[in-house]
Amino acid sequence: MSVWNYVVTAHKPTNVTHSCVGNFTGPQELNLIIAKCTRIEIHLLTPQGLQCICLQPMLDVPIYGRIATLELFRPHGETQDLLFIATERYKFCVLQWDTEASEVITRAMGDVSDRIGRPTDNGQIGIIDPDCRLIGLHLYDGLFKVIPFDNKGQLKEAFNIRLEELQVLDIKFLYGCPKPTIVVLYQDNKDARHVKTYEVSLKDKDFIEGPWAQNNLDNGASLLIPVPPPLCGVLIIGEETIVYCSASAFKAIPIRPSITRAYGRVDADGSRYLLGDHNGLLHLLVITHEKEKVTGLKIELLGETSIASTISYLDNAFVFIGSSYGDSQLVKLNLQPDTKGSYVEVLERYVNLGPIVDFCVVDLERQGQGQVVTCSGAYKDGSLRIVRNGIGINEQASVELQGIKGMWSLRSATDDPYDTFLVVSFISETRVLAMNLEDELEETEIEGFNSQVQTLFCHDAVYNQLVQVTSNSVRLVSSTSRDLKNEWFAPVGYSVNVATANATQVLLATGGGHLVYLEIGDGVLNEVKYAKLDYDISCLDINPIGENPNYSNIAAVGMWTDISVRIYSLPDLNLITKEQLGGEIIPRSVLMCSFEGISYLLCALGDGHLLNFVLSMSTGELTDRKKVSLGTQPITLRTFSSKDTTHVFAASDRPTVIYSSNKKLLYSNVNLKEVSHMCPFNVAAFPDSLAIAKEGELTIGTIDEIQKLHIRSIPLGEHARRISHQEQTRTFALCSVKYTQSNADDPEMHFVRLLDDQTFEFISTYPLDQFEYGCSILSCSFSDDSNVYYCIGTAYVMPEENEPTKGRILVFIVEDGKLQLIAEKETKGAVYSLNAFNGKLLAAINQKIQLYKWASREDGGSRELQTECGHHGHILALYVQTRGDFIVVGDLMKSISLLIFKHEEGAIEERARDYNANWMSAVEILDDDIYLGAENNFNLFTVRKNSEGATDEERSRLEVVGEYHLGEFVNRFRHGSLVMRLPDSDVGQIPTVIFGTVNGVIGVIASLPHDQYLFLEKLQTNLRKVIKGVGGLSHEQWRSFYNEKKTVDAKNFLDGDLIESFLDLSRNRMEEISKAMSVPVEELMKRVEELTRLH
C-alpha cells in the first residue's frame, strides 16, 4: 500500500527570494545573507587577491516556514546586526549570531496572525524603522501591525492600526523623521496610484497624517525606495517614470518602459541605486544634489544580468544578483565598458533550477538510472537542466593521447609514499610519463623497459624493483638505477596474452591455455609452476587481499569457451573452485578485493554486466552470486583508495565506482562519458588522484568523496514550458515561448521544438499560430499502428477572453530528424493535458475529459483523431493521470476525482471524488487505490478509493488518508528514480515519485512498508525533541496541512529531511535518541543511511 510516504529533498531550493548585507557574524565582518524561500544561507565576504572577493559559506539552515521578510537591523547598544525574519504563516523571529558555536540563536519570536482579516493580495510587507523604534508589518488588508522596541532593544507587545488604503502596493519607513513615519503607495478604486505618509504614534497606537502626499503617479508605480540622510525622501519607481519626492522637493525623469523587480543601494548616503528590470537589464540611478538639496535624477544602463529578484551591493563594485528565474550571480561593475558596451562582468554563477515548470525522467545512458531533464527558469533565462546523481571527477591536468591500451602507476622506491611514473601502453609502443617541477605531465624513460612494444602489465616489486610484462617476456628492472636486472622469456612459438602481478608474484597466460607462475626475488625471476588448462584464458588476477599485503595464496582465472571463472591455489596452481557464468559472453576482467572485511570476487563480462561473489579466503569457495548491468561495453576493473578505504573503478561506456556501506556493495555513476582505462596515480602535487583514459585524452583528477546531484545547463534564451522524451527517435520535444522585446504587436512567439537527446541541439521547429500556446505534450503510439508520435495540445489565448474557447491537438511524427505534422484536431477549449489511454488519446479540454481514437479517414487515406466519448463535470480539468481503465483528474478548484472508462458502453463515468475544495497543481497515481495531489497552499495529500464501502455514498467518496505541508509549489510529479536500482539494496524495491517545484526543488516521495514507517515515525518524534527549529519555529506546526479553512497535523507523511539530519548530529545527541528508542546508534545510522540512497 502507498499510504505511508516519506518525503525528502534531493535538490534544495535554489530560487533566491531575498538577500541583505550587513555585519551579522561580527562587528568587522561583512556578510551576505540569502533567503531561498525555506532556507537561509549566511556568507562571509573575504578578499581574494587585490581585485576580487569571495563568498565564503558559513551556514545553510532550513527555516520551518516560507520566508516573507528578511531584514538586518541594529537596535541601540548592539555592536553588530540582528536578523529579522517573518514567515508567510505569520510567525516571526529575531536571530543573533553566536560566535562561540558558529550558529544562530533566537533573540525573540512570536506569532503575528489575527483571527479575522483578509490576507493581502500583494504579499506580506515587513519593514523596520531606520532608528529601530519599531517593526511594521502589513499582513491583512486595512491593517498595519506595529511591534515596538523598548529602549534596550527588546520587542514589546504588538498592536494593529487601521489603514484606510485597501490596495497597498508598497510601504516603507522614511529616514530622518523625528517620529517613525511610513510612506504608503496604494491604488484607489479607479485604478489610479498615489503616495501618502503617516506618522506612527506609539503612545496613541494610531496614525497621524504625515508631512506630505503625492497623487496621480505613473500607473505602473510599484516600488518605493526610501533615501537615507542627508537627502531623505523617497524614490517612486514606475514603468515609465521615476520620481523623487520629499516634503520639499519633487523631481521626475522618464524611462524606457520596464518593470523594475529589484533594487540595491550603492552608497551609504543613498545617492546611487542599482535597478534590475523584468528583462534582466541593470541600470544605475543617480540622485544629483548640491549639499542637501536634490537637483535632479539621472539613469544609465550598465548591462545585462539574470532577471533579478534581489540586488545586494557588497563592496568595491561587487554586486550579488539573486534570481528567481535564472542562475544567481556575483558580478563586478567595471569603470570601462567591454567590447559589447557592458559595464557588468559576471564572476560567478550560482545554479538555480527554479521555477521547474515541467520535467521528464529519462534513462539517456540506458543503464537503469533516471536522469531528470527539467524545464527551468523563465523568460530569457529559460533553460533545460540535466540532473543526475553521480560521483564527480575534478580535473587537475590532461594531455591529448590517442589509442591508450593500458595504464599503471609505479614508485621509484618500494617505501616511497607517492607514485613517480605513469606507464601508458599503446598497440606498438609504451611511454612513461612523470610529473615535472611545474606539476605538468612530461615524458621520461625507464631504460630497462622495452618501450618498442605494448605493455600487458606492470607493477612495483619488492627490493626497489619494477616488473614489466610484454607479449614475449617479463622484465625485472631496478626502480632506482632503472636498469634491467633479469628477464624471463616466453617459450618459442608462444606469446603472452594476459598477465597480472603483485609485489612478489607474476601470473601469465600464453596461447593454448598455458598458465605460468613466477616469483620475484632480489634481481631474480623464478618460474615456479606451469599448468596446461583445457581452454584459453581471458583474464587473471592475484591481487593480495589475505594476511600478506605482498603475496596471494590464490589466483582468479577467467576462461574462454566454457565461460567460467576459476580459483587456483598458489604456488602449486591446483584448481579449487570452478563457477560457470552462464550465457555466451566471456569474462573480460576479474578482481579479488576486500570491502569492510569481506572478500569478494568481481567478474566483469564483455557486455557490460558485472557478477560479484563472496570469496572465502580459506576454502576459495564462491557464494552469494549477484549480477548487475553497468553499461553495454566490456568493463575493466581496478582498485583505488579514497579516504583510506578501498573502492573499485569499473571503466566502460558507463564508468562506475563500486564501494561498500553497511556490508552491501553499492554502485555510483561517475560523471564522465566512456572511460577505457583507469589507474590510481598518487603524486605529491595531486594526492589520491586517478589517471583516466577516455576518447583521445588522458586526464589526472581527484574523485568526489560522495555522490551528489550533478547539473548540466542547456541555455535556451526562451522559456520551455513542457517537455517529453521519445526513446525510439532519441529526441525531446518542447513547447516553448520566446519573448521579443522589440516587436510590440506580438511580444511572444510560441513553438514546438525538437531536440537531439544527446547534443540537446534544436533540430526542427514548428511555429504555433499567433495567440496559440502549447499547453501539453506527449509521446505515444496508437492501437494497430507501429509508429510513435508526438501529440501537442494547444490553446488560443485571446486578449478579450477569460478562458480559451478553442485549441488544437497536433499529431507529429519524427522523420529524418524533422517534425512532420500528420493530423490536427480542433478543440473547444484549451488542451490542458494529454495521456495515452488503451491505444487511444485522452485529452482534458477546459471542463471536459475527451477520448479520441486514431482511425482511418473515410477516404481510406491517412489517419485522424475521431471523438469517441467524453465526461463533463469539472471546473477546469488541468491535470490527468491514468492507470488501466481508471482516470484521475486534478481540478482547478474541486480537488481530485476518479473516472472509469467502460468498454461495453464506450463511456467515461465518475466513480468517486474528494469533496474538499483543493486548488490542484499536480496529481499522480501511487497505486491502484491511492492517489497523490499537490495544491496551491503548498500542501501534499493522498486520497484512497473506497471500493469496499458498504453504501454507494461511501464508495463515491475518495477518502483523505494523508496530509502534509511541503512548503513548496509542486508543478509536476513523475514516477522514477534518481539512483540506480539494485537488486540487493533494501530501498531497491521501494516505489518512488519525483517532484519538481517553483523554487527549484527536486524531491522524492517514497512509499514505505508499514513497519518501516512506524519505526521512522518514532525516530521523527524523537528528533523533534532534540533538533530545535531555527528561530524557535515548530517543526510540527510547519508540516501541518494548512489552508484558509483548516489546519490539521500531518499524517501518513514523514519528513525525510529531518530524519536524515540524524546523521549530522553529535554522537551525544545520537545516543540520547538511541536511548529513547531503545535501538543502538549503529542500527539507527544504518537504517537512516539506507534511506539516503533513495536520492
Swiss-Prot record:
One GO BP annotation is:
red, far-red light phototransduction
The answer to keyword Nucleus applying to this record is yes
Gene Ontology molecular function: nucleic acid binding
What gene is behind this protein?
A: DDB1
Please give the GO cellular component terms listed in this UniProt entry: nucleus
* Signal peptide as annotated in the record: none
Record protein name field? DNA damage-binding protein 1
Q: Which proteins does it associate with, and in what oligomeric form?
A: Probable component of the CDD complex, which probably also contains DET1.
Alphabetical list of InterPro entries matching this protein: Beta-prop_RSE1/DDB1/CPSF1_1st, Cleavage/polyA-sp_fac_asu_C, Quinoprotein_ADH-like_sf, RSE1/DDB1/CFT1/CPSF1, WD40/YVTN_repeat-like_dom_sf
Pathways involved: Protein modification; protein ubiquitination
Subcellular localization, per the record?
Nucleus
The record's listing under Pfam families reads: Beta-prop_RSE1_1st, Beta-prop_RSE1_2nd, CPSF_A
UniProt keyword list: Nucleus, Phytochrome signaling pathway
Q: Give the family, as the similarity comment puts it.
A: Belongs to the DDB1 family.
Please describe what this protein does.
Answer: Component of light signal transduction machinery. Involved in fruit pigmentation and fruit nutritional quality. Acts as a negative regulator of fruit pigmentation. Probably acts by participating in the CDD complex, a complex probably required to regulate the activity of ubiquitin conjugating enzymes. Repression of photomorphogenesis is probably mediated by ubiquitination and subsequent degradation of photomorphogenesis-promoting factors such as HY5.
